[in-house]
Amino acid sequence: MTARRNLSCQPLSDMVSEGGGLKGAGFRHMQEQPAGREQSSYQPSPNVVSYLGRLEYLRNDVPVNDDAGLPNKVPRRLSDTDLEILKAQRVDELPPRPVRDSLMDAFWTRCYPWTPVVERSWVNERGPKQVSLLLQHAMLLAGSRVSATLPDYQPEQFYKKARVLFWTNAEEDPIIITAATLLLHWWNPDGPERVSLDTSGFWLRICTGLAYQVGLHREPTGRADAGLRRRIWWSLVVRDCLINAGHGRPRALDLKLADVSPISIVDFEGAVAPANLFSSYVGISCILGESICCHQTAEC
């Protein structure tokens, strides 16, 4: 049995000041963790580089170095216009603690087993003001979709806040952005017969683009966050298969270009039950997706 790992990350988008307002910079690092607490094995890089696959099709004798000459990333400050938009949408306002805990419990119990893209340490080991607002609203959205309706805390409210945080680039960590965007699939206000920028099919394409940029389609050999990356990738594959089957839309992902290994117990830090459940879910979804593709292309 593999030892459990703590695959957490430091949030970059805490825009809430101690007084509850929005900060001009929009970002700050976590404070140092107390002594005795296990340090995170997933640390966001100050100079996040997207995946480049040029060396996979260029000959070895072609002098290409994708990592050379990369400029240091300058911390981005939200513009005054961005801050006004975020303030108007009241993105820094979260539900009261009892409501928040209830929705988070619903997320972990009913959503996470099927979309295991969030590390518990991202949320449980931090206060609300130390967690990505984009991630929090995405999780609250998902939790509210599988809970009894609360008149004052509708799913649409969480969705709109997460959406504006996404489009204003309030979150910088691409892994958290991808995970949160995957959770927006739980909001699907319109049927497939309507053209919409708010459906799961739309966000699927956004997630696909992010996944390829981050390189989630490649086996994360030797990475501390390998299990997290595999879970995010296969969660995206599942959504692609289900949307393909439910809506009849072409697949967004080409699995022939991916070499990510199947889900295993290691990816769930040694937890057998959730690993087996998600692995079976992925397998069934892939069979369904391949069957639909065969029918659509008349290959069967």
What residue ranges belong to the model's regions?
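Acidic, Ser/Thr-rich, low-complexity intrinsically disordered regions in fungal proteins
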Residues: 87-281, 285-300
